[in-house]
Regions:
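N-terminal helix-turn-helix DNA-binding module of bacterial transcription factors
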Residues: 1-51, 333-334
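Short histidine/acidic/glycine/proline-rich micro-motifs that form metal-
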Residues: 59-62, 89-90, 116, 175-180
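Amphipathic helical "hinge" segments at domain boundaries
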Residues: 21, 36-109, 187-190, 194
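Short beta->alpha connector loops
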Residues: 89-92, 113-118, 237
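Short beta-strand segments enriched in small/hydrophobic residues
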Residues: 6-11, 45-61, 161, 169-176
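Short, conserved catalytic or interaction motifs in soluble domains
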Residues: 14-15, 36, 88, 115, ...
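Bacterial carbohydrate/catabolite-sensing allosteric modules
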Residues: 33, 71-82, 97, 103, ...
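Residue-level recognition of specific faces of alpha-helices
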Residues: 8-11, 15, 30, 41-44, ...
Length: 334
């Protein structure tokens, strides 16, 4: 249409050689008329790069992973990368299939918030043969950069806060006990209680699944059995569920029961009462993960030893925790 060779068109599209203004105008006019889009596949074969990054998360409905993904996407976009987003639904088989698809797409790097048992997962990720950053938990046997919050320290700070408010009968709602994140957060809870020589009441640690509904059911069990004056929930969603369980029983938060979560997702600011929590900006954590991967891609996949970036958590005190008060006698509650 422009009356020029394929080579000349290539030079115009890629700005690889000088082309006269008249020829450039003809080629660009033809491009507009034909709605021509350069082949990313062809470019990637020549450059051996696609400017794409794969992201695999275990649960896209969890606001934590939505905020994490937003931070990753923003940082990648600022550096000229697009993100392929995959949700594994906590299913190791689905996760493995996504990893294969991403590898077929010739991604430049991979960020994984993982699901599954370490041994199998380590081999699956190693087989991806791409620069890799793991978010949230270390995977034994895998040489990869790691970005995570200090889970144990965060749980310790949350529990210590409740103890400093005078609470002793404290319940703990944990995620699935077979996950590394849950184990670290439970360990922080236990350490804080032990430091103050406060016994953990039998049945005070209730297993859940990191969801609002799971937190609701776990808190309901605690209120029916242990009757804690405070609850540490292993993430904010379970903390929100605990708020609901308390309200249904006529328990005032924080007057009758203090509740603190973990993660500091944006949603926790808008509950009533606003949920006290511990954590760090989830979006900033995503940005850090993306930047770590971009640096790894730029320096070559094996240019340096694997890095471990652990973010220090902080207490975010809002309206759902308060000083312990002795329960009022039945019939005398204001």
């Amino acid at each position: 249409m422009a009356g020029v060779s394929f080579t000349t068109v290539s030079h115009v599209v890629n700005n690889s050689r000088p082309v006269s203004a008249d020829v450039r105008a003809k080629v660009e006019g033809a491009i507009r008329e034909l709605n021509y889009v350069p082949s990313a596949v062809a470019r990637s074969l020549k450059a051996r790069a696609t400017a794409t990054i794969g992201l695999v998360v275990p649960n896209s409905t969890n606001p934590y992973f939505a905020e994490l993904a937003r931070g990753i996407e923003d940082q990648c976009a600022a550096n000229g990368y697009c993100v392929f987003f995959c949700n594994s639904d906590d299913d190791p088989v689905k996760q493995r299939n996504y990893l294969r698809v991403l590898q077929e797409k010739r991604i430049d790097g991979l960020i994984v918030a993982s699901a599954g048992e370490d041994t199998v997962l380590a081999q699956t990720l190693a087989d991806a043969h791409a620069p890799l950053v793991v978010v949230d938990r270390n995977i034994e046997g895998l040489a990869a950069d790691l970005v995570q919050i200090d889970h144990e320290r965060g749980a310790y700070l949350a529990t210590r806060h409740l103890l400093e408010l005078g609470h002793a009968k404290i319940g703990c709602i944990t995620g699935p006990t077979d996950t590394a994140v849950s184990a670290m957060r439970v360990h922080g809870f236990i350490r804080a209680m032990a430091e103050r020589s406060v016994d953990i009441v039998p049945g005070a640690i209730a297993e859940s699944d990191f969801s609002c509904l799971g937190g609701y059911h776990a808190a309901s069990r605690l209120f029916e059995s242990v009757r804690p004056s405070a609850i540490f929930a292993g993430n904010d969603l379970m903390g929100v569920g605990a708020l609901r369980a308390a309200a249904e029983r006529g328990l005032r938060v924080p007057d009758d029961c203090s509740i603190i979560g973990f993660d500091d997702i944006e949603f926790s600011r808008y509950t009533y009462p606003a949920l006290s929590t511990v954590g760090q900006s989830v979006r900033a954590l995503g940005e850090m993960a993306a930047q770590t991967l971009i640096e790894r891609i730029g320096g070559g996949a094996s240019a340096a030893p694997s890095r471990r970036r652990v973010v220090s958590p902080r207490l975010v005190l809002r309206e759902s925790t308060a000083i312990y008060r002795e329960p009022a006698p039945a019939g005398n509650r204001a």
